[in-house]
Amino acid sequence: LNRKVESLFGRFLMGLEYLLNQSGPVTMGASQVCGFVKSDPSRATPNLQFHVSPVSTDILGVTPMHDFEGITPTVANIRPTSRGEINIVSNDSRIYPKIKMNYLSTDDDRKVAAQGLKIVRKLMLETETFRQYEPEEYRPGVHITDDEELVKAGSDFTQTIFHPVGTCKMGQDNMAVVDEKL
């Protein structure tokens, strides 16, 4: 869909198809495929969620489409161990808090990220289903095989993809972010 999405005439045709038939790319969500797997068989439950979008871009919703046709498989760690922070910097409610995402700050999250990228790579490049289309890996690139290098390359386009997770503790101890009076 890259060329259709990036072309004014292509967008016009997609809009017209929707207006006339209530069908076509305009009716699709951002992801056409979703799946859950374990990054390692020893895990009790799946910890990776995969999505596949019918467009190719570096960061979905942020950067323009590539100038070639492609798809974007993404992988999300749905059980991260890294912990971020949200800090209030002013008593003025109009001042945004300071948010530190702290992605990939634990060894486990880095290991899961590398495994997730390897699983996507294997699915896209080694399965008979996709091999017939002669796929090429654009990012991070097949030349990157070392786990830490995969994590580093992957961190260049890491985002929450709509799934920030976490809790805040109420109480009196050092782990509490608010007391009973908020």
Task: Annotate the PLM regions.
Residues 9-182:
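FAD-dependent oxidoreductase catalytic-site/capping-region signature
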Residues 1:
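Predominantly flavin-linked oxidoreductase catalytic cores and closely associated redox partners
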